[in-house]
C-alpha cells in the first residue's frame, strides 16, 4: 500500500485530518467581527473533508466560500457534503496548491486555515496569504506552538517534523512583523487532541505495519507523554487598511 492510499485508510471516516473540533472552529469564527448575514467572500485553505468549510457556510449564511485542497479525494468528499446540504450555489471546491493561490489581489474578506499553514511554513503563509485578503480582512490560522518549555522528547520530535514550531510569543511577533493587526489567540483544548488520536488509533489498528504507521504511533506517544508542552493555537489577525 503506497503512502497516499495508506493516508486515506488511516483517516477513514474521520471528519478532521488533525486535532480540532466544531466547538473550537466556532470559537475561532466568533472572533471575526463581521455580521453573520453579511455577503462576504471566504477562502478556506487546506479544507480537507470540509469540517471548517461547512461551519463557515452555516455561520455566514449569505457568503460565498472557496474551499481549496491539494488532494482530490477529500474535495470529492466535500463536494458530496455540499450537495447534501444544498450549498452548491455558494460553496465551491478547487484543487489548488496553497503555495500558489490563483486569485486576484484583495479578493477575500476572510482567509481561514486550520492546521495547514505548516505545509508551507507559518511565516511564509502569513506573507503569501495576505495578498489575497481585502483591507480589514481577517486571517484565522491554527498553528502548532510551544505552550511551555518543551521536554527533550517533544523538542526532538517536533524539531524534526516541523522546524518552525515556536512559542506563542514568537508567533505573535511574526504576525506583527508582517504588518497584521493582531487580534487574539486561544489554545486548542486537550480534548481535541484526545478525540482525534483515539479515532486515528482505531483506524491504525486495522492497517499493516510500516514506517508511515510507526511515525503516526510515535506522534501519539510523544503527545501522551508531553501534552502540556505544545498544542495547536488559533491566531486571529486583520490586514490593516494601509496595506
Q: In which residue ranges do the predicted regions lie?
A:
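Class I SAM-dependent methyltransferase SAM/SAH-binding core
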Residues: 43, 50-100
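A short acidic, Gly/Pro-enriched loop at the edge of an enzyme's catalytic core
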Residues: 99-111
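A short glycine-rich, Lys/Arg-flanked "PGG" loop and its adjoining helix->strand segment in the class I
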Residues: 124-138
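Conserved Class I S-adenosyl-L-methionine
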Residues: 184-243
Amino acid at each position: 500500500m503506497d503512502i497516499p492510499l495508506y493516508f486515506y485508510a488511516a483517516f477513514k471516516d474521520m471528519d478532521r485530518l488533525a486535532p480540532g473540533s466544531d466547538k473550537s472552529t466556532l470559537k475561532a469564527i466568533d472572533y471575526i467581527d463581521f455580521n453573520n448575514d453579511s455577503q462576504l467572500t471566504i477562502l478556506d485553505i487546506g479544507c480537507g473533508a470540509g469540517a471548517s468549510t461547512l461551519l463557515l457556510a452555516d455561520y455566514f449564511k449569505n457568503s460565498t466560500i472557496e474551499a481549496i485542497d491539494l488532494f482530490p479525494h477529500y474535495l470529492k468528499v466535500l463536494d458530496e457534503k455540499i450537495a447534501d446540504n444544498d450549498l452548491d450555489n455558494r460553496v465551491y471546491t478547487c484543487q489548488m496548491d496553497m503555495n500558489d493561490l490563483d486569485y486576484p489581489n484583495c479578493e477575500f474578506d476572510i482567509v481561514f486555515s486550520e492546521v495547514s499553514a505548516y505545509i508551507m511554513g507559518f511565516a511564509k503563509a502569513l506573507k503569501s496569504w495576505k495578498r489575497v485578503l481585502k483591507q480589514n480582512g481577517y486571517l484565522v490560522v491554527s498553528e502548532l506552538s510551544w505552550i511551555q518549555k518543551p521536554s527533550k522528547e517533544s523538542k526532538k520530535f517536533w524539531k524534526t517534523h516541523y522546524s518552525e514550531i515556536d512559542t506563542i510569543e514568537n508567533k505573535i511577533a511574526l504576525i506583527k512583523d508582517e504588518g497584521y493587526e493582531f487580534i487574539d489567540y486561544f489554545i486548542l483544548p486537550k480534548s481535541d487532541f484526545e478525540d482525534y488520536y483515539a479515532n486515528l488509533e482505531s483506524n491504525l489498528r486495522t492497517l499493516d505495519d510500516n514506517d508511515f504507521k510507526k511515525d503516526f504511533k510515535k506522534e501519539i506517544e510523544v503527545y501522551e507523554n508531553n501534552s502540556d508542552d505544545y498544542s495547536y493555537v488559533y491566531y486571529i489577525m486583520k490586514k490593516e487598511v494601509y496595506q
